[in-house]
Structure formats: structure tokens, C-alpha cells
Amino acid sequence: MEIISSCNTASITPYVPNTSNPWDVMKVKHLYKRLAYGATTTVLDAALSQTPQEVVDALLLDAQTTPNTPAPAWAYWDLSDFNDYDTENNEFISEWYRQAAKDIRDKNLKGRLTFFWLNHFVTQIETYFYAPYTFQYWDILQTHCLGNFKTFVREIGLNPAMLLFLNGFENSSQNPNE
């Protein structure tokens, strides 16, 4: 009796279209639904004129070369930089949420991966409620969404939003908050 140790029985062999498994509009749509948020007819038609590997390579290159969202003027402000902290901070957080939603939607694979890591390295805005930390956290997610995981974990662990979320301010060398 054969014992299967994994529920994933697929191989990691690259997909090569053939007559029984063609590179068609359904496969292209599926790819763009997984690695982006769908595609226009023009994009689908262009993808059909390329090999699957060329399309995937182009999507990865796009994610690697798409710049991070530029820092807003308030991205590294201290409390003393605010004129009216309550009003401005609320406005900046709302502004940033709109920008983050736009990034997720418009930056294809980079947007999807940033959103994925947002749900993996979770913080809670109510814990720190500070617009500059919100941007800085997002910037780390965008910077490292396709990069070295060890570097990513180190950077996200030192981010002010994450440190506050994890009560890092309660740590000391004699009494770590674990």
C-alpha cells in the first residue's frame, strides 16, 4: 500500500502548453487572477502571444521594478511636527488607507504580495494610532515583499508599529516581555 505524505500531488515541472493542455485565454485569466487582480482584454491578448514563462517573468519583473509608494510629507514626523495632532493624524491615516487600497489594486503582484504580508505580519492601528508609523510599516512591506525573508523579518520586527503592537517598550535585558 502506497502512503502519500503530501496532499500536493502536482509536480513543480514548468507548464508547457500542448494540444491537450493549451495556453488559452482561460489559463491567462487564471494567471492574472492569481498574480494580479485580473487583466484587460488588451493585456490578455498580449499574454496569449507570449509563452507562459515570458508572461510570468514579466509579472515578476514588474513587481521587482515597481517603485514603492513615495513617502508623504508627514512620513517621518515627530509629534512636535503636527500643528493639530488629533485632526491631522486622523486625516493622514485616512489618506494612507486610501493610498494603500490603491497600491493593492494598482500594483499587480507587488500589491498582492504587500497585502499578503500585511496579513502575515499583523499590527493593530488602535495600538499605536500614529500616521507616520502606518506609512513606515507599509514601506517595509513593499520593500521586502519579494526579497530576503530573513532581512524582512528583522526589519519588520524593528518597525515602531510592530514594536508597539508587541509591547516591545516593556522589554529590558533583565526582563524580556515574552
Walk through the language-model features, giving the residues of each.
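N-terminal module-boundary/linker segments of secreted carbohydrate-active enzymes
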Residues: M1-E95, K102-D103, N108
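Primarily short, surface-exposed interaction patches in extracytoplasmic proteins
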Residues: A39-D57, N89-E178
